[in-house]
């Protein structure tokens, strides 16, 4: 089976062609980072309009690079949610329209299920069951995964997600958009010594996350310290260490609670080098393994949507002709494969 995947949940237009026998045949990605940089964040209306401009040329490019024509496509998968409703509807409209015109089945994919399954695109893919840490600009959650669609959310962010905290803290430090990667780059030059940043919600039972207080603590520290490059780097490092330690502590608890020894990390923040190092060390110390997608598939992309959609289309799941987008969509409401 060969599936065309379409991702337009936020500020990246991602298109891919995935074959269940040959693997990933092509993927094309357009990022709107430059478009939104002047505003310090994603402007939903601008994002939607840019998806409209880019999506059809990218589909043509992906099909050409995959040496695939319409007759070779067996189904279409598009991101249905969660995300920005205008951006979601662009992908949903195009995906449903192509499915109708080409007489192909189509399915709306959960964006976070795409991230969760992204490590399956790698040669050394994890086997079920495992615990997944999904960390991005909009989500931070720990999920017990027993199979595709067999999800139990163990904990999630009650306010700011980890990626959102990175971006907002970077803005406080005067760093350009997108802030998360720039803060991590600055942190690599710093030393956390001398700062005692809190590890939020680790002093109590449970697996939920909260990063808004840590952001406020960082803002107060910035205001109280000298405004020089090394001090800013040290504060960035202390902030990063606090976030990473918090995520690691919660992951260890989730693994102990489930009895699993495989950990998947996915989402934009999973590209963070310090997070990867810390979780790799932790899993080695407890005799487990950690899995994550390659860097280009940590952020939003069409490949993960094509892969996730293919699994459900193969199981006979598809949707009607209605164009739907779901800005909010709990992951654990998804049905299992038939």
UniProtKB/Swiss-Prot annotation:
<keyword id="KW-0819">tRNA processing</keyword>
<dbReference type="GO" id="GO:0002949">
    <property type="term" value="P:tRNA threonylcarbamoyladenosine modification"/>
</dbReference>
<feature type="binding site">
    <location>
        <position position="111"/>
    </location>
    <ligand>
        <name>Fe cation</name>
    </ligand>
</feature>
<feature type="binding site">
    <location>
        <position position="115"/>
    </location>
    <ligand>
        <name>Fe cation</name>
    </ligand>
</feature>
<feature type="binding site">
    <location>
        <position position="300"/>
    </location>
    <ligand>
        <name>Fe cation</name>
    </ligand>
</feature>
<keyword id="KW-0012">Acyltransferase</keyword>
<feature type="binding site">
    <location>
        <position position="272"/>
    </location>
    <ligand>
        <name>substrate</name>
    </ligand>
</feature>
<protein>
    <recommendedName>
        <fullName>tRNA N6-adenosine threonylcarbamoyltransferase</fullName>
        <ecNumber>2.3.1.234</ecNumber>
    </recommendedName>
</protein>
<comment type="similarity">
    <text>Belongs to the KAE1 / TsaD family.</text>
</comment>
<feature type="binding site">
    <location>
        <position position="180"/>
    </location>
    <ligand>
        <name>substrate</name>
    </ligand>
</feature>
<dbReference type="InterPro" id="IPR043129">
    <property type="entry name" value="ATPase_NBD"/>
</dbReference>
<keyword id="KW-0808">Transferase</keyword>
<feature type="binding site">
    <location>
        <position position="167"/>
    </location>
    <ligand>
        <name>substrate</name>
    </ligand>
</feature>
<comment type="function">
    <text>Required for the formation of a threonylcarbamoyl group on adenosine at position 37 (t(6)A37) in tRNAs that read codons beginning with adenine. Is involved in the transfer of the threonylcarbamoyl moiety of threonylcarbamoyl-AMP (TC-AMP) to the N6 group of A37, together with TsaE and TsaB. TsaD likely plays a direct catalytic role in this reaction.</text>
</comment>
<dbReference type="InterPro" id="IPR017861">
    <property type="entry name" value="KAE1/TsaD"/>
</dbReference>
<keyword id="KW-0408">Iron</keyword>
<dbReference type="GO" id="GO:0005506">
    <property type="term" value="F:iron ion binding"/>
</dbReference>
<feature type="binding site">
    <location>
        <begin position="134"/>
        <end position="138"/>
    </location>
    <ligand>
        <name>substrate</name>
    </ligand>
</feature>
<dbReference type="InterPro" id="IPR017860">
    <property type="entry name" value="Peptidase_M22_CS"/>
</dbReference>
<dbReference type="InterPro" id="IPR000905">
    <property type="entry name" value="Gcp-like_dom"/>
</dbReference>
<dbReference type="InterPro" id="IPR022450">
    <property type="entry name" value="TsaD"/>
</dbReference>
<dbReference type="GO" id="GO:0005737">
    <property type="term" value="C:cytoplasm"/>
</dbReference>
<dbReference type="Pfam" id="PF00814">
    <property type="entry name" value="TsaD"/>
</dbReference>
<dbReference type="GO" id="GO:0061711">
    <property type="term" value="F:N(6)-L-threonylcarbamoyladenine synthase activity"/>
</dbReference>
<keyword id="KW-0479">Metal-binding</keyword>
<keyword id="KW-0963">Cytoplasm</keyword>
């Amino acid at each position: 089976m060969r599936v065309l995947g379409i991702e337009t949940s936020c500020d990246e237009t991602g298109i891919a062609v995935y074959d269940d026998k040959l693997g990933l045949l092509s993927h094309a990605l357009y990022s709107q980072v430059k478009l939104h940089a002047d505003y310090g964040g994603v402007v939903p209306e601008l994002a939607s309009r840019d998806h409209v401009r880019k999506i059809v040329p990218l589909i043509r490019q992906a099909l050409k690079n995959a040496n695939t024509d319409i007759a070779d496509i067996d189904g279409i998968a598009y991101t249905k949610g969660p995300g920005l409703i205008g951006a979601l509807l662009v992908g949903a409209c195009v995906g449903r329209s192509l499915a109708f015109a080409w007489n192909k089945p189509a399915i709306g994919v959960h964006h976070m299920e795409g991230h969760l399954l992204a490590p399956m695109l790698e040669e050394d893919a994890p086997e079920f069951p495992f615990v997944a840490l999904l960390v991005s600009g909009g989500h931070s959650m720990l999920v017990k995964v027993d199979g595709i669609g067999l999800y139990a959310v163990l904990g999630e962010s009650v306010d700011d997600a980890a990626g959102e905290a990175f971006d907002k803290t970077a803005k406080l430090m005067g760093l350009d958009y997108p802030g998360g990667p720039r803060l991590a780059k600055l942190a690599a030059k710093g030393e956390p010594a001398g700062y005692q940043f809190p590890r939020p919600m680790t002093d109590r039972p449970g697996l939920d996350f909260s990063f808004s207080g840590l952001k406020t603590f960082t803002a107060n520290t910035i205001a109280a310290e000298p405004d020089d490059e090394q001090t800013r780097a040290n504060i960035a490092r202390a902030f990063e260490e606090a976030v990473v330690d918090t995520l690691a502590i919660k992951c260890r608890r989730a693994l102990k609670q489930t009895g699993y020894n495989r950990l998947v990390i996915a989402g934009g923040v999973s590209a963070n080098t310090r997070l990867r190092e810390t979780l790799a060390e932790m899993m080695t110390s407890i005799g487990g393994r950690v899995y994550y997608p390659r860097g280009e598939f940590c952020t939003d992309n069409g490949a993960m949507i094509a892969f996730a959609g293919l699994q459900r289309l193969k199981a006979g799941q598809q949707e009607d002709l209605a164009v739907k987008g779901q800005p909010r969509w709990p992951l654990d409401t998804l049905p299992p494969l038939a």
